[in-house]
Amino acid sequence: MARGGRGRRLGLALGLLLALVLAPRVLRAKPTVRKERVVRPDSELGERPPEDNQSFQYDHEAFLGKEDSKTFDQLTPDESKERLGKIVDRIDNDGDGFVTTEELKTWIKRVQKRYIFDNVAKVWKDYDRDKDDKISWEEYKQATYGYYLGNPAEFHDSSDHHTFKKMLPRDERRFKAADLNGDLTATREEFTAFLHPEEFEHMKEIVVLETLEDIDKNGDGFVDQDEYIADMFSHEENGPEPDWVLSEREQFNEFRDLNKDGKLDKDEIRHWILPQDYDHAQAEARHLVYESDKNKDEKLTKEEILENWNMFVGSQATNYGEDLTKNHDEL
């Protein structure tokens, strides 16, 4: 989640690859299946009932995606349970032998925050070229677009020309929004806001604006129903729409289009992708407690958690299983 020219073809390849990684809201291939825009990692958690307690495919895929859901397979069941037990002791803040929904929510939020800052740390050195522990806009621009800017002829007749031409001003606009003191240089906190704008209150207008720009194909400043559907689903000519598409059309009319004018403005887009009444960590914590609470006392013992260990290994409570492969002292 370094670009630039280290050799002609290698530089181009790295630039394109990292452009895809670090500007996910800009480059989007047309999907053939449903795509979720709502800014929350477990997009549909709480919107449809989980599978039975014998299968956690829904949990893993909702939290991770299909590929990352296999992370927990790195350890044997006994190793997973042993390490999960140590994590449970840390989640139980008051040491009363129970894990409450609130304690789980606090832990999940901590894991989320750590994941974001770890992600920034991994790419920091690629952009901080003068090693002053700050990243200027010029450093970022050269690392990201240097090859493109230095070799425009190679891109002139390609789709990449349009892509980079669109990305550069958008990245600059987002960088300036994250740069709170306006010095065109990002601290780690500011660069984190640049890479993960959905996590910062002062960046949410940028998230809304970029979403509008991505979906609004006719350029009228609104998202109509067809644009809303086209962002989620690539329709085959004369082909039938899946049932979920029909359901999304109903969602658009009944819940997205608040003023019933047939289109979404910025406020309605904000309400859609940044719902104020949804706490992702709270929803997941409640889900984990509900699925593991055998005696229905609305809190979990270590035994209840370990009995349902494979659900927790695949959830954000263990950073999708990654915490189980770390030394306990790292947590």
From Swiss-Prot:
Residues that coordinate or bind Ca(2+) 2: 128, 130, 132, 134, 139
Gene name for this UniProt entry: RCN1
Pfam families associated with the record: EF-hand_5 (PF13202), EF-hand_7 (PF13499)
Binding, Ca(2+) 3: 179, 181, 183, 185, 190
Species of the source: Homo sapiens (Human)
Protein name listed in UniProt: Reticulocalbin-1
Post-translational modifications: O-glycosylated. O-mannosylated by POMT1 and POMT2 and elongated by POMGNT1.
Record's GO cellular component terms: endoplasmic reticulum; endoplasmic reticulum lumen
A GO molecular-function annotation: calcium ion binding
Binding site for Ca(2+) 1: 92, 94, 96, 103
Family classification: Belongs to the CREC family.
SUPFAM superfamilies membership: EF-hand (SSF47473)
Record-annotated EF-hand domain positions: 79-114, 115-150, 166-201, 203-238, 244-279, 280-315
Lineage: Eukaryota, Metazoa, Chordata, Craniata, Vertebrata
Phosphothreonine PTM sites in chain numbering: 76
Note: This protein has four functional calcium-binding sites; potential sites II and VI have lost affinity for calcium.
Binding-site positions, Ca(2+) 6: 293, 295, 297, 299, 304
Glycosylation sites noted in the Swiss-Prot or TrEMBL record: 53
InterPro entries documented for this protein: EF-hand-dom_pair (IPR011992), EF_Hand_1_Ca_BS (IPR018247), EF_hand_dom (IPR002048), Rcn1 (IPR027241)
UniProt-annotated binding residues for Ca(2+) 4: 216, 218, 220, 227
Chain location of the short sequence motif Prevents secretion from ER per the record: 328-331
